Regions:
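An acidic-aromatic loop/edge-strand motif
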Residues: 32-35, 51-53, 59-61, 66, ...
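Short, hydrophobic beta-strand segments
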Residues: 144, 249-258, 667-673, 768-787
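Extended substrate-binding grooves/exosites of carbohydrate-active enzymes
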Residues: 53, 57-62, 128, 177, ...
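Beta-strand-rich structural segments
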Residues: 209-212, 272, 628-632, 682-683, ...
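Extended acidic/polar, glycine-enriched regions
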Residues: 149-152, 210-301, 669, 675-676, ...
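Extended carbohydrate-recognition surfaces in non-catalytic/accessory domains of CAZymes
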Residues: 26-113, 165, 171-174, 186, ...
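Short flexible loop/turn segments that cap and initiate beta-strands
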Residues: 219-223, 262-268, 633, 639-650, ...
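Accessory beta-strand-rich segments of carbohydrate-active enzymes
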Residues: 36-39, 87-190, 216, 229, ...
Length: 815
């Protein structure tokens, strides 16, 4: 690097953006800072768009954060080498982001709002340290009023990630949005606004609201207005502002449209501060803030279990880590929408943000799409699970982190409970019980409207110590055999499966013979998609279904996990190459595994499910036993191979924790012998009437490329994404399930190649190079919209089989 480049700190070719802000006393301005320059560990500066994950480009390498540890949570007692535990990507190191902001007139107030920065961010404004936050997952605010001046202002954020600080892939950098808020000296404190529904009676919602005005003067008052989704308005009286700047309002909203997963109605809340409201012109507007929320009630009790809007329901939830697969940790609205849509179509109605604070963008998506949320905070407290984890900060920062979590997110109707921890080692101790009481109490002070929980993986110890007894919602992680003996000892009268299943599978992989096993591993680093393999501490989905169905006092579950994530490649923690999980109901690319349809058959009550497995293309297995399963909500089915019946069977209820319990939720033909041709299942309803069928055919040679997009057009904002599933089909249109061809991607027009993923946990191919091999016949390529209207074109070429013609897809990009 030459000297000139070293000195190019804030030149226009390097800095992220130049913008003009004018902040009069009456004007509030909020600008998203999305264009920055970035350098890692002293490397050359490059321009990047924020949100940005500095590590996702790779390359994969087992030396990144190579950990030699015993994973106590998994029951390990001896340390072994864990090569892919945190994703095998280069997230460790120091990074620096810089941008500039032009200000014409100095505002009375200015703050930088970070939705998360990985990690230990230190913020500088015009060379002066303005703020710091320890926890990379939390939102925080930096008051920079005194550091700004007229003209160009330099903003710098320095971050540091250290080794052995995470049990999964954390990402690195400014991976969530950064905003600059400017307002007058007198302004509404955004996080002070709090709207909660106290009760709903005969269609009338009783709502309380509050807020605080910084720099309030005696001649000022406030007003609040609730605007319904149908255009209805409910206005407050003129609100007095106390000496402490606080104001309070109550509303009676008639014909309230309540928020729920089935009907996610949202209200706009407009808050205004007025000076001299009795003046000749009706007063002067000092500040105004608009937010969205929903009206709904949440409660838990011995009598009703979990209730939303007064109606008892069992949570059908999944755990989701924060990474977005090939996008890494960098948050993206289109990617989040796709995740939530996949889970809702499966029938899920809740997610758990394991094991950390969620992004604001994710909560907004859950609000608008109707997905309940358990918003989690910590994976550890005082005692570390990894050498340099959050335990370093807990004593000093825990209360501040809980405060920011709750204040930042308490107006999101999707959040139905807070979680203060996951599998905390202190759960056996009096110290742990006291910390639970303290953190739960803080949540109650900041938000009395929601219950608090945490996930406990040592139920006997947690109950004995009182750790589980003091929680609003006792949550057990796995150990379904511990539910019955511990439930009578819990004073709450109900129990949540805060983390369940941990069944492992690889999409499109089937192992023979089929075994039910808690320790199965194979030389290829894959797991069987017959969904009969799990971990030593966990279980199969069927056991959780049985517990939810047969125990009235269970209030639901959160499955580990809804989608595969980077890092934690159990059961191949010691295997290389393996760098992402096998737990997902969907793979890392977001493609449903067979298990998706098992959950769908139990959870999606709006649509029927008929799903056959495995695929029916097995050259070399002719005449060999190849079991066939069907996942369906129907109770009975008959299977045919080339027209020959393999038997008509019904689901049966089993009471024991053994293989027979599978037959309660699955239809299984275990003695089918493979022969090429047609596999067909015919399903019957409870009255024995034929209700539907599904057919699989043996695939021939690949004849063409099939492209299936998850949407028909994109928004020209430079951020929107389309996910295109790429597969090979034969001349009859049958997918070739074993295809592993190398596919190449070219994007032209108003869009660009973003990333690609095939869901193979053992693949070391780059996510950001425009080519990748199919994994078991499929992959997903992601294309990003440009900033101008027009058309984008995706061209996919099979580099392995030149006889297959390239496939082309076009898509409109609209403003």
């Amino acid at each position: 690097m030459n000297k000139a480049k070293k000195n190019m700190k804030f030149l226009p070719t390097i800095v992220a953006m130049m913008m003009a802000l004018c902040a009069n006393a009456q004007e509030r301005s909020e600008v998203v800072l999305n264009s920055w320059s970035f350098s890692q560990d002293g490397s050359e500066w490059q321009q990047v768009a924020v949100p940005h994950d500095w590590a996702i480009s790779g390359p994969f390498d087992k030396r990144w954060d190579l950990q030699r540890v015993a994973i106590v949570q998994n029951g390990e007692t001896e340390a072994t080498e864990k090569s892919g535990r945190s994703g095998a990507l280069p997230w460790i190191g120091e990074g620096c982001y810089r941008t500039t902001v032009d200000i014409d007139a100095l505002p009375g107030f200015a703050e930088l709002v970070f939705d998360g920065a990985m990690s230990e961010p230190t913020v500088y404004v015009n060379g002066r340290r303005a703020g710091y936050w320890a926890y990379g997952y939390n939102a925080f605010r930096v008051d920079c009023t005194e550091f700004l001046h007229s003209g160009s202002n330099a903003i710098e954020v320095r971050l540091k990630n250290v080794e052995e600080s995470s049990r999964w892939y954390p990402g690195g950098g400014l991976y969530r949005p950064v905003r600059l808020l400017t307002a007058g000296k007198t302004h509404i404190d955004d996080w002070s606004l709090y709207i909660r529904t106290m009760s709903v009676n005969d269609g009338v919602a009783h709502v309380e609201a509050e807020g605080r005005v910084a720099g309030a003067q005696p001649d000022m008052t406030a007003t609040m207005t609730l605007e319904g989704p149908d255009g209805s308005r409910t206005e407050s009286d003129r609100l007095s502002i106390g000496a402490d700047g606080k104001f309070y309002a109550t509303f009676k909203v008639k014909d309230a449209q309540l928020w729920s997963p089935e009907s996610p109605s949202l209200y706009r809340v407009v808050t205004k501060v007025i000076r001299n409201a009795d003046g000749p012109r009706g007063g002067e507007l000092v500040d105004s803030k608009t937010l969205k929320t929903g009206l709904r009630t949440v409660s838990v009790s011995r009598e009703g279990g979990f209730r939303l809007n007064g109606i008892s329901r069992k949570l059908k939830g999944v755990c989701l880590h924060h990474d977005l697969g090939p996008l890494g940790a960098a948050v993206n609205k289109a990617a989040l929408i796709r995740q939530i849509r996949l889970m809702k179509e499966m029938g899920a109605d809740a997610i758990r943000t394991s094991h950390n604070m969620p992004s604001t963008m994710q909560m907004e998506v859950c609000d608008s799409m109707g997905m309940m949320v358990m918003a989690e905070s910590f994976d550890m407290w005082i005692y570390p699970k990894c050498k340099n984890g959050y335990a370093r900060f807990f004593r000093e920062w825990a209360e501040r982190d809980i405060t920011n979590l709750v204040l930042n997110h308490r107006n999101h109707p999707s959040i139905v409970m807070w979680s203060i921890g996951n599998e905390i080692p202190e759960q056996w101790s009096e110290e742990g019980r006291q910390i639970s009481v303290r953190l739960q109490g803080l949540c109650h002070v900041l938000d009395p409207s929601r219950p608090v929980t945490q996930g406990m993986d040592r139920p006997d110890d947690a109950v004995r110590s009182g750790f589980a007894k003091v929680m609003d919602v006792p949550g057990f992680n796995y150990r379904v055999h511990k539910y019955d003996p511990n439930f009578p000892l819990l004073p709450q009268g109900f129990l949540l499966g805060s983390e369940t299943a941990s069944t492992i599978s690889s999409r499109g992989v089937y192992k023979f013979p089929v075994v039910v096993s808690d320790h199965a591993v194979y030389p290829d680093g894959q797991c069987s998609s017959y969904d009969t393999e799990y971990c030593s501490w966990s279980n199969l989905p069927d056991e959780d279904f049985r517990m939810m169905d047969d125990r009235s006092w269970t209030i639901g579950q959160f499955v580990w996990t809804g989608i595969d994530y980077l890092g934690e490649p159990t059961p191949y923690d010691e295997y290389w190459p393996s760098r992402s999980s096998y737990f997902g109901i969907c793979d890392l690319a977001g493609l449903p595994k067979d298990r998706y349809y098992l959950y769908r058959s139990q959870w999606n009550t709006r649509e029927h499910t008929i799903h056959l497995l495995p695929h029916w293309t097995w050259p070399g297995r002719e005449g060999e036993v190849t079991p066939v399963y069907s996942y369906t909500d129907y109770p009975e089915a008959e299977l045919f191979v080339n027209g020959k019946s393999q038997g008509r069977i019904r689901k049966s209820i089993g009471e024991n924790r053994n293989e027979l319990s599978l037959d309660r939720y699955r239809l299984r033909w275990n003695e089918v012998r493979y022969e090429p041709g047609e596999l067909k299942v015919v399903v019957y309803d409870a009255d024995g009437r034929q209700a539907g069928e599904q057919t699989l055919c043996t695939a021939g040679k690949a004849a063409r490329i099939r492209l299936q997009a998850d949407r028909t057009s994109l928004q020209a904002d430079g951020n929107d994404l389309v996910y295109v599933t790429v597969s090979l089909v034969d001349k009859k249109g049958n997918e070739v399930p074993t295809a592993a061809d190398l596919m190449q991607f070219d994007v032209s027009g108003e869009g660009a190649f973003k990333c690609v993923c095939n869901g193979d946990a053992t693949s070391l191919e780059s996510f950001v190079e425009p080519q990748m091999h199919l994994f078991n016949g499929k992959l997903v390529v992601t294309v990003q919209a440009g900033q101008h209207e027009g058309t984008l074109t995706l061209r996919v070429t099979d580099k392995t089989n030149r006889r297959v013609k390239p496939a082309v897809m076009t898509m409109d990009v609209k403003k």
